[in-house]
Amino acid sequence: MQHNKIKVAFLDRDGVINKEVNYLHKIEDFEYTSKCIVGLKKIRDLGYEIIIITNQAGIARGYYSEKQYQLLTDWYRNDLKEKGVDILDIFHCPHYPDGIVPELSKDCYCRKPSPGMIEQARKKYSIDIKSSILVGDKNSDIHAGERAGIPRCFLVKTGHPTSEPTENAILSNNLFTISKLIE
C-alpha cells in the first residue's frame, strides 16, 4: 500500500489522446491529436501520473470485441511508452444501455458521466484527488470529474465540438496548452 498520495491526470481517450474516430478499434485508424505527445510528456514532468478513462460503447453495441479493444489499447500504450510516456493505468467502460450484447447492455456506474472509473482508480491507487486534474472532450467527461471531486477539469477542442461547455470546465486547445496552464 502506498503511503504517499499521487496526483493524477485523468484523461479521456477519444478526442484527447487520439483523433476522434467513431468506434475506433483498428490500429491503422489510430492517430494522435495535435501536440498530444509533447503535452503528455510535460504533464508527466509536472509530477502527474496518467490514467486513461474511456467509455467504449462499441463493445456493447457489437461493433468490436473486448479482444479488439484490448489489442488497440496494448498497442497505443506500448507506442506511448516507446515515445517516452508511461501510462499508469487504463480503465474502460464496455457498457451501453441500448447495446446488443446482453451482458453489457445495461446502465452502469462506470460509464461517464458517472464517476465509476475514477472511483475504481482511487480504490486501486492512493490518489490525491484534490491535486488531480481531468481532461475530456465532452461535457460527460467533465461531469464525471466534478462528481469525483476533481477541482480542475479541462475541456479540449481536439475532439467533439462542444458549443456549451459546462460552467466549471476550463476550455483549452490541446494537451500541450493544458500542460502550460497547470505548471
Curated annotation (Swiss-Prot):
Q: Does the keyword Disulfide bond apply?
A: no
What pathway does this protein act in? Nucleotide-sugar biosynthesis; GDP-D-glycero-alpha-D-manno-heptose biosynthesis; GDP-D-glycero-alpha-D-manno-heptose from D-glycero-alpha-D-manno-heptose 7-phosphate: step 2/3
Molecular function terms in GO for this entry? metal ion binding; phosphatase activity
> Which branch of life, at top level?
Bacteria
EC numbers on record: 3.1.3.83
Query: Where's it found, cell-wise?
Result: Cytoplasm
Q: What is this protein called?
A: D-glycero-alpha-D-manno-heptose-1,7-bisphosphate 7-phosphatase
**Source species of the chain:** Photorhabdus laumondii subsp. laumondii (strain DSM 15139 / CIP 105565 / TT01) (Photorhabdus luminescens subsp. laumondii)
